[in-house]
């Protein structure tokens, strides 16, 4: 039964991590530089499932080391190498998450594939520095036990403590502190609300946005000396008044603007005929009626062409140079804010998933490293039974 369960775990580990590598390498949406951590982590887990777990299963089932003595030493070194690499990868991912949240603009500009690969190389070098000493310095191994050969980890106290601290306790402490810090940053960010993150509406309604683009678009809209106020909507039209209006000094040929600024109807309302198809007499009559709000199109092309859809909750201010869209939450700043909000949501979701992974990781690894370290601290009185170990 144990062999069947372990075999299923081996196959599941290989298949699942192979899918992770395949997804990152083939999907464009997953080709972000930080996902290289997942590729390297998945590779380390696949190596554990193929080179470590099968020999460990055979050793437990047979009760002795069936393979060569030299392979036992290499096997133990690879065991420490791959497991330490997997743990330090999780630590590096947590640090990457923290830097991306705390220093978003600065770190995201530096988060290049080259930089991520250098961090991954450093992770593997740390794992190698912890796993290779038993191969280089074997120390006093003592007499070999009689009977069938055994393959056991290094029992020297200095190596047990140093490898346990470097492989588990130090990375685990770093991950716990980092994710606690990320949680506090996310909590403080949620308390501030969207306005602290640059909510639309603070500075967006103060600057009009062009409605159209191209040669007929409004290039330089008139400058409003004072803020305009909306009096109210009557007969399907919104009347906008201001204390003072003046034209820009860049174009001396532009006539002086009248006191009442005509406003086009809101979305869903039909436009009146103003320029396209009007006779000179009709245009003159329209100019004489200065107190009545007029619907002036941006250009003859826009008046004769298909009706442009304007966003809901926005108004179009008609000027002598064209149309100016006074939007509520519409524009580049609003789009950037929503994109930033979606990005933060993804960051929080990813951080939550990684936190679950870290929790499972601690529950799985802590019993082994705790009992392994006790053998170096008090080998006589605190020794854990071999079956439990």
Swiss-Prot record:
- Major subcellular site: membrane
The record's annotation in PROSITE patterns points to: G_PROTEIN_RECEP_F1_1, G_PROTEIN_RECEP_F1_2
MF-aspect GO terms: alpha2-adrenergic receptor activity; epinephrine binding
Spell out which residues lie on the membrane's Cytoplasmic side: 26-36, 96-117, 181-353
Q: Residue ranges of region Disordered?
A: 192-218, 231-310
Name the residue ranges with Basic and acidic residues bias.
234-249
The entry's keywords: Cell membrane, Disulfide bond, G-protein coupled receptor, Lipoprotein, Membrane, Palmitate, Receptor, Transducer, Transmembrane, Transmembrane helix
Q: According to UniProt, where does the site described as Implicated in catechol agonist binding lie?
A: 163, 167
User: Which stretches face the Extracellular side?
Assistant: 63-72, 141-156, 378-386
Q: Does the keyword Transmembrane helix apply?
A: yes
List S-S links within the chain. Answer: 72-151
Oligomeric form and interacting partners: Interacts with RAB26. Interacts with PPP1R9B.
What this chain does, per the record? Answer: Alpha-2 adrenergic receptors mediate the catecholamine-induced inhibition of adenylate cyclase through the action of G proteins.
Stated family: Belongs to the G-protein coupled receptor 1 family. Adrenergic receptor subfamily. ADRA2B sub-subfamily.
What this protein is called in its record is Alpha-2B adrenergic receptor
Species: Procavia capensis habessinica (Abyssinian hyrax)
Q: Which taxonomic lineage is given here?
A: Eukaryota, Metazoa, Chordata, Craniata, Vertebrata
């Amino acid at each position: 039964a144990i062999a069947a369960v372990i075999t299923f775990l081996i196959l599941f580990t290989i298949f699942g991590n192979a899918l992770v590598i395949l997804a990152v390498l083939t999907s464009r949406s997953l080709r972000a530089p930080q996902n290289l951590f997942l590729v390297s982590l998945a590779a380390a887990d696949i190596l554990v499932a193929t080179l470590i777990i099968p020999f460990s299963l055979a050793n437990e089932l047979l009760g002795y080391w069936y393979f060569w003595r030299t392979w036992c030493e290499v096997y133990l070194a690879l065991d420490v190498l791959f497991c330490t690499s997997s743990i330090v990868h999780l630590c590096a991912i947590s640090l990457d998450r923290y830097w991306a949240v705390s220093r978003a603009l600065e770190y995201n500009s530096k988060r290049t594939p080259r930089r991520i690969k250098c961090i991954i190389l450093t992770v593997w070098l740390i794992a190698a520095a912890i796993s290779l000493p038993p191969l280089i310095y074997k120390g006093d191994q003592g007499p070999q036990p009689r009977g069938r050969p055994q393959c056991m980890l290094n029992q020297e106290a200095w190596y047990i403590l140093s490898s346990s601290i470097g492989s588990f306790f130090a990375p685990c402490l770093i991950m716990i502190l980092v994710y606690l810090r990320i949680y506090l940053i996310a909590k403080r960010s949620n308390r501030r609300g969207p306005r602290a993150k640059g909510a639309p509406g603070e500075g967006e309604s103060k600057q009009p946005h062009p409605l159209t683009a191209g040669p007929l678009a409004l290039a330089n809209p008139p400058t409003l000396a004072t803020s305009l106020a909306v009096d109210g909507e009557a007969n399907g039209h919104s009347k906008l008044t201001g204390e003072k209006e003046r034209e820009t000094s860049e174009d001396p040929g532009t006539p002086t603007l009248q006191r009442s600024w005509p406003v086009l109807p809101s979305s869903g309302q039909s436009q009146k005929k103003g320029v396209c198809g009007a006779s000179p007499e009709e245009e003159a009559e329209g100019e004489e009626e200065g107190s009545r709000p007029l619907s002036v199109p941006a250009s003859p092309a826009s008046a004769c062409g298909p009706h442009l859809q304007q966003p809901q909750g926005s108004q179009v201010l008609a000027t002598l140079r064209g149309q100016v869209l006074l939007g509520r939450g519409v524009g580049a700043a609003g789009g950037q804010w929503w994109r930033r909000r979606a990005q933060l949501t993804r960051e929080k979701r990813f951080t939550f998933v990684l936190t679950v992974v870290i929790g499972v990781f601690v529950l799985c690894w802590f019993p082994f490293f705790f009992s392994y370290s006790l053998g170096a601290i008090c080998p006589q009185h605190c020794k854990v039974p071999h079956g439990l170990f």
